[in-house]
Amino acid sequence: DFSLSLDARSTAIVGENGAGKTTLVKLLKGLLSPQKGDILYGRENIKEKTVASLAKEVGYVFQNPDDQIFQSNVLQEVMFGPKNLGMKNAEEMANEALEMVGLSHQTQANPYDLSLQERKMIAIASVIAMDPKVMILDEPTIAQDSVGKDRIANIIKVLRAKGKCVIAILHDMDFVLENFERVMVLFHGKILAEGEAEEVFCQDEILHQAKLEKPYRIALKEKIEEIYGVSKTKRKDNENS
């Protein structure tokens, strides 16, 4: 039960399990219908659009790639979405997407012979290949090592450079701080806070209520400022004595 407006900024949706994050993005994708109220994409109510037509505008990468992958060949999996553009164009777009996610050497592999980390990348590539204006990523950093997280960060950067709107559900607050312009904190189905990442993560009361961990960089900065403040006070006391 809330009102919000999403713009071109990259947006991270955070909150504890059960806060309503996945429900929200499924509403945005048209996989669920709101019980009341409206969701507008541009000026058009998504209730008036089919899931198929909305898929051309809004791409959604599932948290579990196995809920999304169904082909027995990586290239065929990624080509499936843009097939309506012709096989040649679909293959070019699929290869470009696989290059972006670091799997250009696995085009002929069976997705289920690859690791969970790689399958998540296949799922991301499948949506990138469809070239939607909005990309929704559900927990993209889960099962990723530092190399995988760096690659996802680069994918977000490339998508933003192409003018895409990137929305992601995340539990990794350090990743959120470094890669997203805007943060939305959900709590029991309501927006507890939203704004620029640096500002939101400095609100201790909000983080405590939402059971979120403060990003390391901000926690370290605050600790240094606290220590500096103490030493500065001591220095003044010494000067006055």
Predicted segments — roles?
Residues N89-Q106:
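Conserved ABC ATPase "signature" region
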Residues L170-H171:
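H-loop/switch region of ABC-family ATPase nucleotide-binding domains
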Residues G37-N45, L54:
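Conserved ABC transporter NBD signature motif
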